[in-house]
Amino acid sequence: MSPLKIYGPIRIRSMQTGITKWKEGSFEIVEKDNRVSLLVHYNTGGIPRVFQLSHNIKNVVLRPSGIKQSRLMLTLQDNSFLSIDKVPSKDAEEMRLFLDAVHQNRLHAAMKASQGSGSFGTILGSRTSQKETNRQLSYSDNQASSKRGSLETKDEIPFRKVLGSPGRGPIKTVTGGGMAVTRTIPSLTLTSTPLRSGLLENRTEKRKRMLSGSELTEDYPKENDSSSNNKAMTDPSRKYLTSCREKQLSLKQAEENRTSGLLPLQSSSFYGSRAGSKDYSSGVTNLDRCNVSSQTPSAKRSLGFLPQPTPLSVKKLRCNQDYAGWNRPRVPLSSHQQQLQGFSNLGNTCYMNAILQSLFSLQSFANDLLKQSIPWKKIPFNALIRRFANLLIKKDICNSETKKELLKKVKNAISATAERFSGYVQNDAHEFLSQCLDQLKEDMEKLNKTWKTEPVLGEENLPDTSATKVFTCPVITNLEFEVQHSIICKACGETIPKREQFNDLSIDLPRRKKPLPPRSIQDSLDLFFRAEELEYSCEKCGGKCALVRHKFNRLPRVLILHLKRYSFNVALSLNNKLGQQVIIPRFLTLASHCTESTKPPVTLGWSAPVAISRPLRACQMMNSCITSPSAPSKKFTFKSKSSVTSCLDSDSEDELKRSVVLSQRLCDLPGNEQYQEDVEKDLKLCRLEPGKAELENSGFDRMSEEEVLAAVLEISRREASPVLSPEDDDKPTSSPDTGFAEDDIPEMPENPDAMEIEKSKTITEPGPASFTEITKDCDENKENKTPEGSQGEVDWLQQYDVDREREEQELQQALAQSLQEQEAWEQKEDDDLKRATELSLQEFNNSFLDSLGSDEDSGNEDVFDMEYTEAEAEELKRNAETGALPHSYRLISVVSHIGSTSSSGHYISDVYDIKKQAWFTYNDLEVSKIQEAAVQSDRDRSGYIFFYMHKEIFDELLETEKTSQALSMEVGRAARQAS
């Protein structure tokens, strides 16, 4: 049957990857064993993405996109969204009909009715294989380079098999369940020998596998019985082939010792077997690399020999001379996976990098921050929560330079509130963590207050709208817990409860007794919650002594413990580090510090019901099934003359004509004065409610340019709203995953003069008449018409040249001044960074010998030691490995400090990745894998901050991840079987 494959720009949106950019590629249908899959290939190479279609299609939409072209949009059951644009309308319609058949379970009936016809019956019509061949060959001819073409072929290798017949014939590329494309290539034939994959050749070897003498005698004359070919038997290349037979004999023994599953080498599979042992394991790929046009018409050989061997053709046989990739061994698939990369050190910012890596590893924290549709446009541009979320989203998909800029913005947002973190001085990681969490809570509190006071479009008809204006704070939901302090009078027993909220606990080092083994973090935690006596005046009986007990009133999802390893030295005015060994258990238990009324952690389920129930703008939706790259509301306002001119200045005359017609229609509207007043009102309304315009234009991504213009014109007639440029149609302003706009990354210009220049150029809210004048001026400038007046053409040209020269001089001067200022600023920043780095290295080297710390007692006489019974000690020891006791917490991250003082040294973080189910060490930019046992043993003297997750929450996240991975593997296995 004919293959079903279409080509064009592709964009995919899914829960795992977010939204991708438009990339050239193809959609290919694969059907086998009553299962239908969609393979997405990219021209840039890489592993094809597989999407199961059987019982998985939610919606199929086909829309026009240009002249005789269409855009096909496919929505799956998990709200994954696939789009392919610029597809010929006929091909797109056939694909839509096929997908509809799969959706309605009509595929197999249709295929059974048309079995053996080479088509999909009424679904696909009579598509011949030659037609598909022409389209595929013409498409491959239009590629930018042969490298891209080869990568595209490589991309399709895992799903193709090469079949053929002896002698001259077509090459069939088999795909999926019998779908094939026939390419007729003269003088080239592939036999039915399977691909010899897995045979790797030594890079140092430059020998060629040749045929044995008997095989050559049997096959070669039969394929070459013309006079020209018989003459070629005596030319120099014949001698070359003879000499190669001896080499073949030396390789014969090695060939016999290879895997028994591989078939013996045959004459016509010379290149096929060689390609199987190189980077490109497909015969089709090797054919693409052969220069077919250079062969003589009389050549009738099989693929094993080049026609009319000459020194030039012999040179071409040695492919390694032209392309080094032929000699390169096949790289394992695992090496193609993206290398993990941490955060760059901006200059003594290792404390920030370590804390950010530990926080970002908390999957529930990240979900609460990104998946509750926070209205980011209502949050100030430099707010920490906005910078924080932006870095969290892009840390795994952007390059190191972009990541460095995002880190600077996070640091600036912190420094704006806490000046001690400005500059490049080493700071305490725990202080940074506390400041970060407090600032995130403040930002969320401000957002909720703003959200309650401002009216939201579309909520007038919703019941109980006040309850829909609350967003969950990720810090409160995941990290905050509540402790109840009960003050009990020892005289009368009067109890006074007091509650206190914490984001983390600062616990003391437990005192170590020489004969006993080192204490653990469990001991320090129990030490914190021990009952203690204090002086307290009882209001009831006047007693002066009371007992204080501490119990958890509400548990967190993640418990952060700060181990106080520093003691202040009064003489030196320094915080000396205590290197006492503290055992790091895998599990902690809070059972002895909880009561029957203790509330468990907030259950998973990131979607706050009140926040999700509200009507969301498309730019805020994480899992929306419709992409909405509508322009920001600021683009709905009338722009300055210069900006409109630049917008209309295009090489396309049709676009200019459409703009002129649009402006004339606006001028023809009745009541220009009333129209101007309405425009001013709408502009003010857009400033107050920027989301309104976005809601009205959320569907522009699906429309063509003509439809967008018509829609905007209709809106302007009905509501007197400003006009949206059609050029903004295909420029997404936000990601459907998070709602962040693309302009979140660049900063505002720091030069105030540049901002003043922009303000001076802006014409405030011109009416339709002025818009028409601007368009006409643009038209005149584009046509280079001479203005009417008393001056002649020569005078006007001279004046034009003078003005142009003056403008160029002013532009050059401004550019030179800007470059000088930029260079001076960069030089100053580099000098500061260099000095800070040198200072950090010097302090680190001085304190490195002291980094191991002292194994002596903490020396804190005020700290009591915890005493356990033998049974309690044994139970705690077992729980440290199993987590069997109630309210157990599992270790998921450790922030360690290497050094002797808090103002020097270096911070690193060890993080457990739930998705990869492995531990990783983040040392600024370097990331390495580490075993959990190594974390527990290597950080017992340097561990500073510990993150423990509630065992039930951890198990639920881990089970969810395992289920997701198993499902992905099942889909991949089904796709491989279908191929």
Swiss-Prot record:
Residues 704-723, 806-825, 828-847 form the UIM domain. It comes from the Eukaryota. A motif (D-box 1) lies at residues 71-79. It is an enzyme of class 3 (hydrolase). Polyubiquitinated via 'Lys-11'-linked ubiquitin by the APC(CDH1) complex during late mitosis, leading to its degradation. Able to mediate auto-deubiquitination. CDD domains: Peptidase_C19 (cd02257), PH_USP37_like (cd13312). One of its GO terms (molecular function) is cysteine-type deubiquitinase activity. InterPro entries: Papain-like_cys_pep_sf (IPR038765), Peptidase_C19 (IPR050164), Peptidase_C19_UCH (IPR001394), UIM_dom (IPR003903), USP37-like_PH (IPR032069), USP37-like_PH_sf (IPR038093), USP_CS (IPR018200), USP_dom (IPR028889). A motif (D-box 3) lies at residues 160-168. Pfam families: UCH, UCH_N, UIM. One of its GO terms (cellular component) is nucleus. Residues 149-159, 774-786 have a biased composition (Basic and acidic residues). A motif (KEN box 3) lies at residues 782-784. The KEN box 3 is required for interaction with FZR1/CDH1 and is essential for APC(CDH1)-mediated ubiquitination. This is Ubiquitin carboxyl-terminal hydrolase 37. The lineage of its organism: Eukaryota, Metazoa, Chordata, Craniata, Vertebrata.
